């Protein structure tokens, strides 16, 4: 049975390319900046994406005295994801569409410069899935890099805000958009693409930092030449060991040319290991959401990747959810940490997937070390087989096994995952990761859908609701919380502690040397907890719901903590897009989120504010 697909309310002009001779290696500059905790120079505070700060002026004893130091209104409503950069005492702030960038003087809080790109809202906004968000900026080579919603990548002079160059990264008329923060690596700017719900084939691209010229592009699926996979050198985990992927490892897992509209987009966060010269990231769900229309494992959607930063060639790749049947979009960040596992120090890559499993891999080889549920409510799979690396799917919750036009009930987690894009933090003091999580399940009904370029290519109806189970034991307890904040040991795959939250925690966390971990809540609280115990030490209600990441820096000898508030994102789409949540028929609106989060509007409204906190003088 075919059903009409309706575009949902969720969420240009290109300048001439200016040729600039020579190239510079910017990552030595970025590395130097990130080693000084007075800066917050990348989305994750460092190349490894750990979101940890050595600052400790704010600690477990005095954080209770924290108070707002100053605020800044962005002038834009809807979802504010990401967080501010602070580079050499200057703050850089971004907004959701229209993607305005502000440079702020911290002494006066005055705007040094602002830049708003020219974009066609009528073309771009209708094809933005899950709100008009933007996750932040990148700095390098004296430039601020903005990845616009309309896919244009723009380089701005960090001192003046003048455009240096811009380049088109995709075509919004085909459903392509961008929401992620780019990453500067050596003489390149790394970026990806959004649009999996429109049949966009995902890729990672590297542009020259000086000229904007394309250096390389590696697709998530397709022939080896497209994916930049070397059949004999690129490895994966199977049969209990690391081994070459072999020829046509992607196309052999698709029926016909379905891979050309196969999804696997790359709208998450990117990490980098300078010693290994590898870029790490995740690829998203296959298109369509109806698994019956795309037989096979659909490689390499739903995968973790390690690519050579110079050439884009794939070092290793690991697929977490073969033939994804639930939209468990695998784009979440990969944090790079050296840890002792079973008595041996390992260079690890740690990833908390929307599918509810926390993965620890050897980041050098791609060897699978740990794969365990970080929310025990997860039921779509019983476990991950460590030899094959494949999840063991429970047929009761298999949307393909149950069939098209059949409502598969009680699947945990819901499509927005046990964790969405909001990045984790890691404290070397405790050895724990801190996870902002969702505690939501769903009913999921796939249906046949036809592909039309630039039109939604979803093929499923879903509704979401509280998991009603204990996070640590998985036992039904009648709880109605939609979120939690969890401490996790990635060496053993065990939950250390977990705090319930009324709504999903959609804010990236921050760990500090002061023993404090910060995060924001959907109803708008900035919270501080003890890194060891999870005990709440501080809370403050900001002007709107928080889906931004908490960042910290130092200015004139004083530590500051800042976070953007502005409710939105998938969980907050009902408020952000003005969808009616007052009728039962709205349960499936916003791709299922409106019904689950209908009470959120009683706690917060639209906004767009940066709130900066500090201890009193």
UniProtKB/Swiss-Prot annotation:
Q: Name one GO biological process term.
A: methanol metabolic process
Q: Where is the signal peptide?
A: 1-26
Q: Which UniProt keywords apply?
A: Disulfide bond, Metal-binding, Methanol utilization, Oxidoreductase, Periplasm, PQQ, Signal
Cofactor(s) listed in the protein's UniProt record: La(3+); pyrroloquinoline quinone
Which residue pairs form cystines in this protein?
129-130, 412-441
- Catalytic site: 327 (proton acceptor)
Write down the CDD domains for this protein, in alphabetical order: PQQ_MDH (cd10278)
Any GO molecular function: calcium ion binding
Top-rank taxon of the source lineage equals: Bacteria
**Keyword Flavoprotein annotated:** no
Query: Which factors induce or repress this protein, as stated in its UniProt record?
Result: Highly up-regulated in the presence of lanthanides such as lanthanum and cerium.
Cofactor details (free text): Binds one lanthanum ion per subunit.
Enumerate the catalysed reactions. 2 Fe(III)-[cytochrome cL] + methanol = 2 Fe(II)-[cytochrome cL] + formaldehyde + 2 H(+)
Q: What's a Pfam family this protein contains? A: PQQ
Q: In which pathway does it act?
A: One-carbon metabolism; methanol degradation
Which residues bind pyrroloquinoline quinone per the record? 135, 179, 194-196, 265, 267, 354, 420, 506, 570
Which Gene Ontology cellular component terms are annotated?
Answer: membrane; outer membrane-bounded periplasmic space
UniProt-listed Enzyme Commission number(s): 1.1.2.10
SUPFAM superfamilies reported in the protein's UniProt record: Quinoprotein alcohol dehydrogenase-like
InterPro entries per the record? PQQ_b-propeller_rpt, PQQ_MeOH/EtOH_DH, PQQ_rpt_dom, Quinoprotein_ADH-like_sf, Quinoprotein_DH_CS
Q: Which family does it belong to?
A: Belongs to the bacterial PQQ dehydrogenase family.
Q: What does this protein do?
A: Catalyzes the oxidation of methanol to formaldehyde in the presence of lanthanides (Ln). Contributes to methane/methanol metabolism when La(3+) is present in the natural environment of the bacterium, allowing bacterial growth with methane as carbon and energy source. Thereby is an essential enzyme for Ln-dependent methylotrophy. Uses a specific cytochrome cL, encoded by the adjacent gene in the locus, as electron acceptor.
Name this protein carries in UniProt? Lanthanide-dependent methanol dehydrogenase XoxF
Organism source for this protein? Answer: Methylotuvimicrobium buryatense (Methylomicrobium buryatense)
């Amino acid at each position: 049975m075919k059903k009409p697909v309706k575009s949902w309310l969720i969420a240009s002009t290109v300048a001439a390319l200016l040729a600039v001779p020579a190239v510079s290696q910017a990552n030595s500059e970025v590395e130097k900046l990130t080693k000084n905790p007075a800066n917050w120079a990348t989305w994750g505070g460092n190349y490894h994406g750990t979101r940890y700060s050595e600052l400790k002026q704010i600690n477990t004893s005095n954080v209770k005295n924290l108070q707002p130091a100053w605020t800044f209104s962005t002038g834009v409503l809807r979802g504010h994801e990401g967080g501010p950069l602070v580079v050499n005492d200057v703050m850089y702030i971004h907004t959701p569409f229209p993607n305005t960038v502000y440079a702020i003087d911290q002494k006066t809080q005055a705007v040094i410069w602002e830049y708003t790109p020219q974009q066609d809202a009528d073309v771009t906004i209708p094809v933005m899935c899950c709100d008009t968000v933007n996750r932040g900026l990148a700095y390098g080579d004296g430039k601020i890099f903005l990845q616009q919603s309309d896919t244009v990548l723009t380089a701005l002079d960090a001192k003046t805000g003048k455009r240096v160059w811009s380049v088109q990264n995709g075509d919004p008329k085909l459903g392509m958009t961008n929401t992620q923060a780019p990453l500067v690596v050596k003489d390149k700017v790394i970026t990806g693409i959004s649009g999996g719900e429109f049949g966009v084939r995902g890729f990672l691209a590297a542009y020259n930092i000086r000229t904007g010229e394309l250096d390389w592009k590696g697709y998530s699926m397709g022939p080896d030449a497209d994916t930049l996979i070397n059949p004999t050198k690129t490895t994966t985990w199977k049969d209990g060991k690391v081994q070459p992927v072999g020829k046509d490892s992607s196309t052999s897992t698709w029926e016909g040319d379905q891979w050309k509209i196969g999804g696997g987009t790359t709208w998450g966060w990117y990490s980098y290991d300078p010693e290994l010269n590898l870029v790490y990231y995740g690829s998203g769900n296959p298109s369509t959401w109806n698994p019956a229309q795309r037989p096979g494992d659909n490689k390499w959607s739903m995968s973790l990747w390690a690519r050579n930063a110079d050439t884009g060639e794939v070092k290793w790749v690991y697929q977490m959810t073969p033939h994804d049947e639930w939209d468990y979009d695998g784009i979440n960040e990969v944090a790079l940490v050296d840890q002792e596992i079973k008595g041996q120090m390992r260079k690890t890559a740690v990833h908390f997937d929307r599918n509810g499993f926390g993965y620890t891999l050897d980041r050098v080889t791609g060897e699978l070390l740990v794969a365990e549920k970080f929310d025990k409510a997860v039921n779509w799979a019983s476990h991950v087989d460590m030899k094959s690396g494949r999840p063991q799917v429970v047929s009761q919750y298999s949307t393909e096994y149950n069939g098209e036009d059949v409502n598969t009930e009680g699947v945990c987690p819901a499509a927005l995952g046990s964790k969405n894009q909001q990045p984790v933090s890691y404290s070397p003091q405790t050895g724990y990761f801190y996870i902002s999580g969702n505690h939501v399940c769903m009913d999921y009904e796939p249906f046949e859908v036809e592909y039309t370029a630039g039109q939604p290519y979803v093929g499923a109806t879903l509704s979401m609701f509280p998991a009603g189970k204990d996070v640590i034991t998985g036992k039904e307890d009648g709880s109605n919380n939609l979120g939690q904040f969890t401490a996790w040991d990635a060496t053993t795959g065990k939950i250390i502690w977990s705090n319930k939250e009324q709504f999903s925690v959609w804010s990236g966390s921050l760990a500090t040397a002061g023993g404090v971990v910060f995060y924001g809540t959907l109803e708008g609280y900035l919270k501080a907890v003890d890194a060891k115990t999870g005990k709440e030490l501080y809370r403050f209600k900001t002007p709107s719901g928080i889906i931004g990441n908490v960042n910290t820096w130092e200015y004139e000898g004083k530590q500051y903590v800042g976070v953007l508030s502005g409710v939105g994102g998938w969980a907050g789409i009902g408020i952000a897009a003005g969808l009616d949540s007052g009728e039962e028929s709205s349960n499936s609106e916003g791709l299922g989120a409106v019904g689950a989060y209908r009470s959120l509007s009683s706690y917060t409204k639209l906004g767009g504010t940066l709130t900066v906190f500090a201890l009193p003088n």
